[in-house]
Design a protein with these regions (language model features):
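Compositionally biased, charged N-terminal/linker segments
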Residues: 10-16, 212-263, 272-275, 340-341, ...
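A short, conserved, highly charged catalytic patch centered on acidic carboxylates
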Residues: 263, 272, 361-461
Length: 463
């Protein structure tokens, strides 16, 4: 962190933000929800999500005000804060205490310990993470309130920019590990705060005001969308009517979807009520991402809805093409994030058109090139069955490219790009027009950047 920039921030109004968090820590919680709402508007494009956060904050403050222990907790907070440095198990203890409290609360509801699973406990935590984090923050300023729900991409961008190493992402069904991640995150942020010699209020000002603006605010939402490269199906949430009421060009909404979603991709919204049907077509406004503290784990942002005459499940099922789609055969179960082939999506448009919908202005998809008889088992299959035929289709003959061209990087060190187009073999001065790296699969956007970086590194050696 550049201390000069931080000093300028404090002088330019940041000190007021710090003082507002300090006031909360000392018991002045009046209008705190409105204060956080104003901060979130700089980095969260989903107005409904900001509303939910404000409600959770108000609920937490109401619970604090009603607690007979609140004054006692405030008196002890300074002692707890001083003891944290000498207690490496503090965050684990806090996590275990809340986990046990949630377990007991769920048991009291169902009276069946067999139904109180890690999954159920974590679900309650996810749905109330802002609420619980505000309670934790009120008890000890070393517990940072969490105002990044469905915004882990923003937190990740901040961490990458300021060299804060976030915890490794647990798998989707590792519910207790995902729960622990929040407390591990608190420990990491505390260490960063101590490194910067900040107060807890300064850390909060950094996280929720300085840093989001520094990394671009809501600029991660694309204002000008590219042509779509894919189409995905999502199921409408319970508050779909609210979405439809607020939906407009300027709004983006967060929901579960496919993390491989890219800006411009088509999002087909399927509603279960009042009728089971596709009712609108949207577009992704940001890259999809994994959010381990979002119950559904996989998050997308989308907007720009176009409302259509519903295409019902019965019509999907009875269509000779759409009826063969595995998703339709499964009666639309597990739909969120399911990709449609370009031919399938375009068939949806044809069906909508036949019902009187004007589809001329809706985004279209074109088929991606694949070898019809390709059977891909290993990376070499990608090269032989997909890449080499593609190079020939682009006009390059086999005499114009070479596979595994050796590039010497010094004494005894050699690397081998998968393909080099128009190679020149002058020793120690090898050159080429461009290189191609083949991959059997790229699991996510992060891996795409890693693999692309590998190709760039190879191209900068000699090529």
């Amino acid at each position: 962190m550049n201390h000069y920039l931080w000093s300028l921030y404090l002088q330019a109004g940041g000190q007021t933000i710090v003082e507002r968090f300090t006031a909360f820590e000392t018991g002045d919680r009046e209008k705190f929800a409105a204060f956080i709402r104003s901060l979130m508007q700089a980095y969260c494009p989903d107005a409904a999500l900001i509303d939910d956060v404000a409600i959770d904050i108000d609920d937490a403050i109401s619970a604090l005000n009603e607690s007979e222990e609140i004054s006692k907790n405030e008196e002890l907070s300074a002692d707890k804060d001083s003891n944290l440095r000498n207690n490496p198990d503090y965050y684990e203890q806090v996590a275990n205490n809340l986990w046990q409290t949630l377990r007991e609360s769920l048991y009291n509801e169902v009276q069946d310990i067999g139904k109180v699973t890690d999954k159920e406990i974590f679900h309650v935590f996810c749905d109330n993470i802002v609420y619980f984090s505000v309670l934790d923050y009120a008890e000890s300023p070393d517990m940072i309130p969490y105002f990044f729900p469905r915004l882990y991409n923003v937190l990740s961008s901040i961490a990458e920019t300021f060299e804060i190493k976030l915890p490794e992402l647990p798998s989707r069904r590792a519910y207790k590990d995902r729960f622990a991640l929040y407390y591990n995150l608190n420990a990491i942020l505390k260490a960063y705060r101590e490194e910067q010699e900040w107060s807890s209020a300064e850390l909060c000002a950094f996280l929720y005001d300085f840093a989001p603006k520094f990394v671009g605010g809501t600029n991660w939402i694309w204002s000008k969308l590219p042509e779509p490269s894919a189409a995905f199906v999502i199921g409408a949430p319970p508050d779909a009517d609210e979405w439809l009421r607020k939906g407009c060009k300027e709004n983006s909404f967060a929901w579960q979807g496919n993390p491989e979603t890219q800006p411009g991709d088509v999002i087909l919204l399927y509603q279960w009520t009042p009728t089971s049907a596709f009712t609108s077509i949207w577009q992704a406004t940001a890259p999809g991402f994994i959010d381990p503290l979002f119950w559904y784990y996989r998050c997308i942002y989308f907007g720009r809805p176009v409302y259509v005459q519903p295409l019902t499940f019965r019509e999907l099922r009875d269509d000779p093409i759409l009826g063969k789609i595995p998703l339709v055969k499964a009666k639309m179960q597990g739909m969120n994030g399911t990709a449609l082939k370009p031919s399938e999506y375009n068939r949806v448009l044809e069906c909508l058109d036949s019902k009187g919908n004007d589809t001329s202005f809706l985004p279209k998809l074109t088929e991606h090139y694949t070898a019809a008889d390709a059977e891909i088992r290993i990376e070499r299959d990608v090269e032989k069955q997909l890449l080499e035929p593609l190079l020939e289709r682009l006009g390059w003959t086999r005499a114009q490219y070479v596979r595994q061209m050796p590039l010497r990087m010094g004494r005894g060190s050699t690397v081998y790009p998968d393909y080099v187009i128009l190679p020149q073999f002058t020793p120690n001065y090898e050159k080429g027009y461009w290189i191609v790296e083949a991959k059997k699969s790229i699991s996510n956007d992060k891996q795409l950047h890693v693999d692309f970086g590998q190709a760039i590194s190879l191209s900068l050696i000699h090529i």
